[in-house]
Structures are given as C-alpha cells and as structure tokens.
Amino acid sequence: MLERSMNISDFDPELFDAIAKETARQEDHIELIASENYCSPRVLEAQGSQLTNKYAEGYPGKRYYGGCEHVDVVEQLAIDRANELFGSDYANVQPHAGSQANAAVFLALLNAGDTVLGMSLAHGGHLTHGSHVNFSGKLYNAIQYGLDETTGEIDYAQVEALALEHKPKMIIGGFSAYSGIVDWAKLREIADKIGAYFFVDMAHVAGLIAAGIYPSPVPHAHVVTTTTHKTLAGPRGGLIISACGDEAIYKKLNSAVFPGGQGGPLCHVIAAKAVAFKEALQPEFKVYQTQVVKNAQAMVAVMQERGYKIVSDKTENHLFLLDLINKDITGKDADAALGNAHITVNKNSVPNDPRSPFVTSGLRIGSPAITRRGFKEAESKELAGWICDVLDNINDESVQAQVREKVKAICAKLPVYA
C-alpha cells in the first residue's frame, strides 16, 4: 500500500540531506551559468505529478498503450502552446533534452557520413553542432565555421565559402556561447545557394525569442530545436518546431523522435513544458526577458570599465564571454575563486584559446537566473564589481570571504522562492 505520508526524509535521510543542501545552495549562491535558471513552483508541481507513472508510446490519438486519454490532452496542450509561442505549425514536445532533439533532426534529415556545417565549439557552438567528440562529429562529416577575429562576430563570408566548397547537406545555426545577434536570413540564403537544409538550435535564446526581443529563426529555418529550460525557464527537456510547411519533414521528425531515438515520452515533463509555455505567453514574461538583456549589458559595462575584455566587445542577449588571456588568469582558477565567493560561473574556451578545454582562458556568464530572483541593473552592476574584485585578487581568500558575505546578504534580500 502506498501512503501519501511516505517521504524521502524518513526513508532515505542521506539522499534527503543532499537534496536539502542543493536547495540551500541555490538560495544562498548567485547563479551565473548561462544555461541555468529557476523554474516556477507550477512547473515543479507538474513535474512531480503522477503523470510520471504513465507509459504513452506514440503520439496523441495514436498510442501503443491504452489509458492515454488524459495524457493525450496534456501533450496536445503542450504542442498547441509551443506553436502559439513561436509561430510554428509543427511541434514535437517529446525530446528528453536538447541534444536528443538535435539527434532526431540529424536522424530525420541526413544519412550517416553526410556533410554538415556548424559553428565550432571553440568559437561558441555546441557539442551537437559537429564536435569530434559528439555523435554529430563521429557519424557525420562535420565542417566548422567560427568568428571573425576582428569583430568577434560570426564570419558569414567564411560560412559561405565553406558551404560552397564542401556542399553540406545541412547548415546549423545557433550557439552555446555567443553574445551577438545571428543573421538567420543570411544563413538561410547560404543554405539555399547549395540546396542544403537550414537547421537552427535556438536553445540559449528561446526565451528571448518567445518574448520578441531577439530575432526568431522560425520563419527562416527548415527545423528549429530548443531546450525548455535555460531562458525559457521551464523543466529540463527538448522541443522541435517548424513552420516550413513540409509535411514530409514533419513525419520524418516524428519518426526520428519515436521510435527512432526514444521510447515512451516523459508525460510529467511534458506537462511541465505545457505549464512553462503558458507562463511564457504571459505579458510579464516579456518584462522578464527584457530585464535579462539589460542585466547582462550592465555587467559588461562594469567589467569593461574595470579593464576586462569581452568577446565581441558587447552582448545583445543573455550571456557574454569574459576573455582572461590578457590577465593571465585561467578559466579554471577564476571559476574556483568565484565559487569560493558563492558566485557560480563556468570556465569556457574563448576564440583562439591557447589552453585546453579543461583549463580554458575564459568564463561564460549569463543573467537569466539572477534576473529570475529579482536583480535589476543596479544589483547586476554591483555583482559585476564583486566579480572583478575577486579576479583582481585571484589568490586572496580574504577578498573572496568579503564578497561571500555580500552575496549572502543580497541572496537573503532577493530569494529564489519567496
């Protein structure tokens, strides 16, 4: 007999302690990892529901199991809301993660060994855009483009030259560490010149796009994928959308997700996605996303005043890359020092980085999580100053201790969950 009174704390105190400590860490530390965010209690409620008990292989109205009439409603709500949010006419809400969504696109549109052209991981791309350590670089002939060394922006001339030379079957747009605005129309124009598919991974900026403050790739791409967390602030998961109008492509995508790459969908996560999409359709979501960009730009301004180099010299979205080569500080050391001050970032390679990916010469910093807990420009500028204080005195633990106390105070003032 399962009783509602059953709980983790009584049954598994060791696990409960780890969960409690992580909950406290999220409240007491400042989160600046660009891919992390806080989902709402409504999303948490949906994800913790009894929907997790239900198997539902297939799609709404076309299941391989009985008893799916209610999860059909849940999934259709998620599909309809995703389409409304992004202006698409096709949505698959079943991918367990962004990487699985990307894998489904490869499986649907390509054959093993086909050539793809994507952004280099070293210049701000993603593992699934052709990195040699990932399936996208192991199973496919991956060619990589990067940034213009002078401007720090995507080198579209290089993209076109590589496309004309290698004739990829698919060109990939999107990034995991790029602070500029991507010219989706230009990339589609290049793809059309060689008859290639144009696929966009908008995972990092999906929330900004949903709010209408970053250009949407949906009118330009054959297929678009995203995660549902990051700037969208939903549960961890993936999403595939399209407005290309090609039913043959839609059918291939559905088959690539199930049965091609996954079995049963995670119904509880799909419910949480539906909640998050509804939240993103509210007017206050645009206010939030606008503040996300303002906060990132405020931090950049302070760091530049303090003598720190920003890749591309600016940010036009939620993140930026701090280039520490001229400071002779490794990303690894900077990450550790800031972590000791209870400021969580991630080390990140910068263009033409002389150090290994395990050490790096940069930091990736993002503003979605701090904005979610109420930071505005004033707090963001103050925070940027604290970061510079720590980096200016990278080995001084007393400075880290001073900043840690300031972090403690502002986190108490602006809790994640009030």
UniProtKB/Swiss-Prot annotation:
Record-listed E.C. numbers: 2.1.2.1
Sites where the protein binds (6S)-5,6,7,8-tetrahydrofolate: 121, 125-127, 356-358
Keywords from the named record: Amino-acid biosynthesis, Cytoplasm, One-carbon metabolism, Pyridoxal phosphate, Transferase
Enzyme class: transferase
Cofactor(s) listed: pyridoxal 5'-phosphate
Protein name: Serine hydroxymethyltransferase
InterPro entries associated with the record: PyrdxlP-dep_Trfase, PyrdxlP-dep_Trfase_major, PyrdxlP-dep_Trfase_small, Ser_HO-MeTrfase, Ser_HO-MeTrfase-like, Ser_HO-MeTrfase_PLP_BS, SHMT-like_dom
Organism: Pseudoalteromonas translucida (strain TAC 125)
Residues modified as N6-(pyridoxal phosphate)lysine: 230
NCBIfam families, alphabetized: PRK00011.1
Signal peptide: none
Protein encoded by which gene: glyA
MF (Gene Ontology): glycine hydroxymethyltransferase activity; pyridoxal phosphate binding
Pfam families: SHMT (PF00464)
PANTHER family: SERINE HYDROXYMETHYLTRANSFERASE (PTHR11680:SF50)
